[in-house]
Swiss-Prot record:
Induction: By water deficit, by abscisic acid (ABA), by cold and salt stress. GO terms for biological process: positive regulation of DNA-templated transcription; response to abscisic acid; response to osmotic stress; response to virus; response to water deprivation. Belongs to the HD-ZIP homeobox family. Class I subfamily. Widely expressed. It is found in: Nucleus. The keyword DNA-binding applies. Interacts with TFIIB1. Residues 128-138, 152-162 have a biased composition (Basic and acidic residues). One of its GO terms (cellular component) is nucleus. Residues 87-122 are annotated as: Leucine-zipper. One of its GO terms (molecular function) is DNA-binding transcription factor activity. This is Homeobox-leucine zipper protein ATHB-12.
Amino acid sequence: MEEGDFFNCCFSEISSGMTMNKKKMKKSNNQKRFSEEQIKSLELIFESETRLEPRKKVQVARELGLQPRQVAIWFQNKRARWKTKQLEKEYNTLRANYNNLASQFEIMKKEKQSLVSELQRLNEEMQRPKEEKHHECCGDQGLALSSSTESHNGKSEPEGRLDQGSVLCNDGDYNNNIKTEYFGFEEETDHELMNIVEKADDSCLTSSENWGGFNSDSLLDQSSSNYPNWWEFWS
Protein backbone atom coordinates (compact mmCIF):
# COMPACT_ATOMS: atom_id res chain seq x y z
CA MET A 1 0.00 0.00 0.00
CA GLU A 2 1.27 3.38 -0.93
CA GLU A 3 1.79 6.17 1.46
CA GLY A 4 -0.88 8.42 -0.04
CA ASP A 5 -3.53 5.77 0.14
CA PHE A 6 -2.78 5.23 3.84
CA PHE A 7 -3.26 8.88 4.69
CA ASN A 8 -6.49 8.97 2.73
CA CYS A 9 -7.88 6.01 4.65
CA CYS A 10 -6.96 7.57 8.00
CA PHE A 11 -8.52 10.90 7.11
CA SER A 12 -11.72 9.23 5.96
CA GLU A 13 -12.01 7.31 9.25
CA ILE A 14 -11.38 10.44 11.33
CA SER A 15 -13.96 12.41 9.39
CA SER A 16 -16.51 9.64 9.71
CA GLY A 17 -15.93 9.50 13.47
CA MET A 18 -16.38 13.24 13.77
CA THR A 19 -19.64 13.08 11.86
CA MET A 20 -20.91 10.33 14.15
CA ASN A 21 -20.07 12.40 17.23
CA LYS A 22 -21.89 15.40 15.79
CA LYS A 23 -24.99 13.31 15.20
CA LYS A 24 -24.89 12.00 18.75
CA MET A 25 -24.55 15.54 20.12
CA LYS A 26 -27.50 16.70 18.06
CA LYS A 27 -29.60 13.83 19.36
CA SER A 28 -28.62 14.64 22.93
CA ASN A 29 -29.40 18.33 22.41
CA ASN A 30 -32.75 17.42 20.96
CA GLN A 31 -33.41 15.26 23.97
CA LYS A 32 -32.45 18.14 26.35
CA ARG A 33 -34.67 20.67 24.71
CA PHE A 34 -38.16 21.15 26.15
CA SER A 35 -41.28 21.96 24.29
CA GLU A 36 -43.51 24.86 25.21
CA GLU A 37 -46.11 22.54 26.73
CA GLN A 38 -43.48 20.83 28.88
CA ILE A 39 -42.14 24.20 30.07
CA LYS A 40 -45.64 25.45 30.95
CA SER A 41 -46.42 22.31 32.93
CA LEU A 42 -43.09 22.50 34.73
CA GLU A 43 -43.72 26.20 35.57
CA LEU A 44 -47.10 25.31 37.08
CA ILE A 45 -45.55 22.56 39.17
CA PHE A 46 -42.77 24.89 40.31
CA GLU A 47 -45.26 27.50 41.52
CA SER A 48 -46.73 24.94 43.91
CA GLU A 49 -43.53 23.05 44.78
CA THR A 50 -39.98 24.36 44.35
CA ARG A 51 -38.46 21.01 45.27
CA LEU A 52 -39.70 17.61 44.11
CA GLU A 53 -39.30 14.30 45.84
CA PRO A 54 -37.74 11.43 43.87
CA ARG A 55 -41.13 9.74 43.35
CA LYS A 56 -42.63 13.02 42.20
CA LYS A 57 -39.76 13.54 39.74
CA VAL A 58 -40.31 10.12 38.19
CA GLN A 59 -44.05 10.76 37.93
CA VAL A 60 -43.57 14.16 36.26
CA ALA A 61 -40.96 12.76 33.87
CA ARG A 62 -43.37 9.98 32.77
CA GLU A 63 -46.24 12.41 32.30
CA LEU A 64 -44.12 14.81 30.19
CA GLY A 65 -42.10 12.16 28.32
CA LEU A 66 -38.82 13.23 29.92
CA GLN A 67 -36.16 11.61 32.00
CA PRO A 68 -36.14 12.13 35.79
CA ARG A 69 -32.66 13.62 35.50
CA GLN A 70 -33.91 16.24 33.04
CA VAL A 71 -36.70 17.20 35.42
CA ALA A 72 -34.25 17.49 38.35
CA ILE A 73 -31.85 19.67 36.33
CA TRP A 74 -34.67 21.92 35.16
CA PHE A 75 -35.91 22.43 38.75
CA GLN A 76 -32.40 23.11 39.95
CA ASN A 77 -31.80 25.79 37.29
CA LYS A 78 -35.24 27.24 37.91
CA ARG A 79 -34.59 27.59 41.64
CA ALA A 80 -31.28 29.37 40.95
CA ARG A 81 -32.93 31.82 38.56
CA TRP A 82 -35.84 32.32 40.94
CA LYS A 83 -33.46 33.08 43.84
CA THR A 84 -31.53 35.61 41.76
CA LYS A 85 -34.79 37.31 40.77
CA GLN A 86 -35.95 37.37 44.38
CA LEU A 87 -32.63 38.84 45.45
CA GLU A 88 -32.88 41.48 42.74
CA LYS A 89 -36.39 42.41 43.88
CA GLU A 90 -35.37 42.60 47.52
CA TYR A 91 -32.30 44.60 46.61
CA ASN A 92 -34.39 47.06 44.59
CA THR A 93 -36.88 47.50 47.43
CA LEU A 94 -34.10 47.95 49.97
CA ARG A 95 -32.34 50.41 47.70
CA ALA A 96 -35.52 52.43 47.27
CA ASN A 97 -36.10 52.46 51.03
CA TYR A 98 -32.52 53.50 51.62
CA ASN A 99 -32.78 56.37 49.15
CA ASN A 100 -36.03 57.49 50.78
CA LEU A 101 -34.49 57.39 54.25
CA ALA A 102 -31.38 59.20 53.03
CA SER A 103 -33.48 62.00 51.56
CA GLN A 104 -35.52 62.25 54.77
CA PHE A 105 -32.30 62.31 56.79
CA GLU A 106 -30.96 65.21 54.73
CA ILE A 107 -34.23 67.09 55.16
CA MET A 108 -34.21 66.51 58.93
CA LYS A 109 -30.56 67.55 59.10
CA LYS A 110 -31.36 70.85 57.41
CA GLU A 111 -34.35 71.37 59.71
CA LYS A 112 -32.13 70.66 62.72
CA GLN A 113 -29.60 73.25 61.58
CA SER A 114 -32.33 75.82 61.07
CA LEU A 115 -33.81 75.07 64.51
CA VAL A 116 -30.40 75.34 66.17
CA SER A 117 -29.78 78.70 64.55
CA GLU A 118 -33.26 79.89 65.57
CA LEU A 119 -32.65 78.73 69.14
CA GLN A 120 -29.37 80.61 69.29
CA ARG A 121 -31.07 83.75 68.00
CA LEU A 122 -33.83 83.49 70.60
CA ASN A 123 -31.31 82.96 73.39
CA GLU A 124 -29.43 86.07 72.30
CA GLU A 125 -32.66 88.07 72.22
CA MET A 126 -33.58 86.83 75.70
CA GLN A 127 -30.16 87.72 77.11
CA ARG A 128 -30.19 91.26 75.71
CA PRO A 129 -33.15 92.53 77.83
CA LYS A 130 -31.59 91.00 80.94
CA GLU A 131 -28.32 92.80 80.32
CA GLU A 132 -30.12 96.06 79.55
CA LYS A 133 -32.22 95.77 82.71
CA HIS A 134 -29.11 95.02 84.74
CA HIS A 135 -27.36 98.10 83.38
CA GLU A 136 -30.46 100.25 83.94
CA CYS A 137 -30.86 99.02 87.51
CA CYS A 138 -27.20 99.62 88.27
CA GLY A 139 -27.39 103.10 86.74
CA ASP A 140 -30.55 104.01 88.64
CA GLN A 141 -29.09 102.78 91.91
CA GLY A 142 -25.93 104.81 91.33
CA LEU A 143 -27.91 107.94 90.57
CA ALA A 144 -30.13 107.41 93.59
CA LEU A 145 -27.16 106.92 95.88
CA SER A 146 -25.36 109.98 94.53
CA SER A 147 -28.48 112.14 94.78
CA SER A 148 -29.20 110.91 98.29
CA THR A 149 -25.65 111.65 99.43
CA GLU A 150 -25.73 115.10 97.85
CA SER A 151 -29.08 115.92 99.37
CA HIS A 152 -27.95 114.67 102.77
CA ASN A 153 -24.72 116.65 102.69
CA GLY A 154 -26.11 119.85 101.11
CA LYS A 155 -29.48 120.17 102.77
CA SER A 156 -28.94 118.84 106.27
CA GLU A 157 -27.59 122.08 107.76
CA PRO A 158 -30.21 124.49 106.29
CA GLU A 159 -32.99 122.12 107.24
CA GLY A 160 -31.66 122.02 110.80
CA ARG A 161 -31.55 125.80 110.95
CA LEU A 162 -35.04 126.05 109.54
CA ASP A 163 -36.30 123.57 112.07
CA GLN A 164 -34.77 125.53 114.93
CA GLY A 165 -36.28 128.79 113.61
CA SER A 166 -39.65 127.19 113.22
CA VAL A 167 -39.47 125.91 116.80
CA LEU A 168 -38.66 129.40 118.08
CA CYS A 169 -41.42 130.97 116.03
CA ASN A 170 -43.86 128.40 117.23
CA ASP A 171 -42.84 129.07 120.83
CA GLY A 172 -43.35 132.80 120.33
CA ASP A 173 -46.73 132.29 118.77
CA TYR A 174 -47.68 129.99 121.59
CA ASN A 175 -46.73 132.60 124.20
CA ASN A 176 -48.62 135.32 122.35
CA ASN A 177 -51.69 133.13 122.17
CA ILE A 178 -51.46 132.46 125.89
CA LYS A 179 -51.20 136.18 126.63
CA THR A 180 -54.19 137.03 124.50
CA GLU A 181 -56.24 134.26 126.09
CA TYR A 182 -55.46 135.32 129.68
CA PHE A 183 -55.52 139.06 129.23
CA GLY A 184 -58.68 138.99 127.19
CA PHE A 185 -57.60 141.30 124.36
CA GLU A 186 -55.83 141.12 121.11
CA GLU A 187 -52.88 143.14 120.02
CA GLU A 188 -53.77 146.37 118.39
CA THR A 189 -52.47 147.48 115.09
CA ASP A 190 -49.28 149.48 114.72
CA HIS A 191 -51.16 152.58 113.67
CA GLU A 192 -53.36 152.66 116.76
CA LEU A 193 -50.38 152.11 119.05
CA MET A 194 -48.47 154.97 117.44
CA ASN A 195 -51.41 157.30 117.93
CA ILE A 196 -51.66 156.41 121.60
CA VAL A 197 -47.93 156.98 122.12
CA GLU A 198 -48.04 160.37 120.36
CA LYS A 199 -51.01 161.54 122.45
CA ALA A 200 -49.27 160.49 125.63
CA ASP A 201 -46.10 162.38 124.70
CA ASP A 202 -48.04 165.55 123.87
CA SER A 203 -49.96 165.50 127.11
CA CYS A 204 -46.81 164.95 129.14
CA LEU A 205 -44.84 167.76 127.46
CA THR A 206 -47.56 170.47 127.44
CA SER A 207 -48.83 170.31 131.01
CA SER A 208 -46.27 170.07 133.74
CA GLU A 209 -48.96 170.40 136.32
CA ASN A 210 -50.37 167.10 135.48
CA TRP A 211 -47.20 165.42 136.71
CA GLY A 212 -47.99 166.43 140.20
CA GLY A 213 -51.55 165.34 139.98
CA PHE A 214 -50.68 161.99 138.52
CA ASN A 215 -52.32 159.35 140.65
CA SER A 216 -50.76 155.95 140.49
CA ASP A 217 -53.66 154.37 142.30
CA SER A 218 -56.12 155.47 139.67
CA LEU A 219 -53.92 154.00 136.97
CA LEU A 220 -53.72 150.72 138.78
CA ASP A 221 -57.43 150.76 139.38
CA GLN A 222 -58.12 151.49 135.73
CA SER A 223 -55.74 148.81 134.50
CA SER A 224 -57.18 146.35 136.93
CA SER A 225 -60.70 147.17 135.82
CA ASN A 226 -59.80 146.83 132.13
CA TYR A 227 -57.65 143.70 132.51
CA PRO A 228 -58.89 141.67 135.43
CA ASN A 229 -56.92 138.92 137.10
CA TRP A 230 -53.73 139.55 135.14
CA TRP A 231 -51.58 138.52 138.08
CA GLU A 232 -53.09 135.11 138.01
CA PHE A 233 -51.20 134.39 134.81
CA TRP A 234 -47.83 135.15 136.45
CA SER A 235 -48.68 133.20 139.57
